């Protein structure tokens, strides 16, 4: 990732996917998604290395969703069947349900991080939900947290389980709207981690020369 092409939209990307994965989309949100500005923004993500094919698949899925006769209700059903049903039928969007940690431990750590940023879980949602973790990442970027802080949070709180989350989603429905959204944000996070790592290496090099 090139610094100039990534720095400005990073927070917006995390925030956008946070909102997309937090709860069922309303008709008003679907109207916005189908608008010219939103479609252009989504298309612009294809310029990020590694995301072009993900973006194309997501755009096709979004077009199908927007043309459904009862799109709000049908997409809500998709969301519920994927994220609201207990595993193994559904897929847990909570970090604490994955092998690297426990619900109590992850939520305790997330709650502490949210307090540091003067934030609180949205609508009483458990703080280890993928959407809240993405929102916190967006907040760290917006507040210009150190590169090391961003990198640590991304690696130790999201990327340590998000690939497993993505794989479980893909096992349920390879081309579903939410499955493709999850794949896109996970692949973006891998690219973002490499970007942050390159900045850390640059910092080390500058200190040593």
Swiss-Prot record:
NCBIfam families on file: PRK04976.1
Pfam families in the cross-refs: Nitrate_red_del
Protein name as it appears in the record: Chaperone protein TorD
Listed Gene3D superfamilies: 1.20.120.1820, HscB, C-terminal domain
Similarity remark: Belongs to the TorD/DmsD family. TorD subfamily.
Keyword list, A-Z: Chaperone, Cytoplasm
PANTHER family: CHAPERONE PROTEIN TORD, CHAPERONE PROTEIN YCDY
Domain of life: Bacteria
Location relative to the cell: Cytoplasm
Gene that encodes the chain: torD
Gene Ontology cellular-component terms listed: cytoplasm
Protein's GO biological process: protein complex oligomerization; protein folding
